[in-house]
């Protein structure tokens, strides 16, 4: 439950029924064929409360990123976009910079980070041994399919791929140590990507 200054219930103005925050997305009910990249948020600002933002897992996606399906036993499969890791970091930096600019005098968010315009990379490692481990490595661009720019698949296939193998496991180990280095703000930490 969210309360306003006077103690009034503002939950429905701030959140959708799924308890994720309503932001600058288009939440109108649409058929999957009518979904467009412009449905997705760009600033992550609450339309009701301009001083509130929701980055990463906190914002409510306007819809799944692909057509929902049902498994043979009736389980709904409705893929949602990745809102942790790399996308969260980019969105968080964008929101933080907009807030800093607004503190400095801007009257609205100055930065944008639409998931329909950004890519993501993920490495899921299995096993701990340096020579026998394996990993699934994948990239996707854009995160939210854009059938206007990429009519056949909704994504740029030159920048969207996946691979399973030992090299991905080594990348995961390297990234693990780089992110710990970055988290400790060691020299050159800002050069390490999200």
In which residue ranges do the predicted regions lie?
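C-terminal, flexible cofactor-proximal segment of oxidoreductases
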Residues: 84-87, 91-194
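FAD-site-proximal beta/loop scaffold in flavoenzymes
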Residues: 1-88
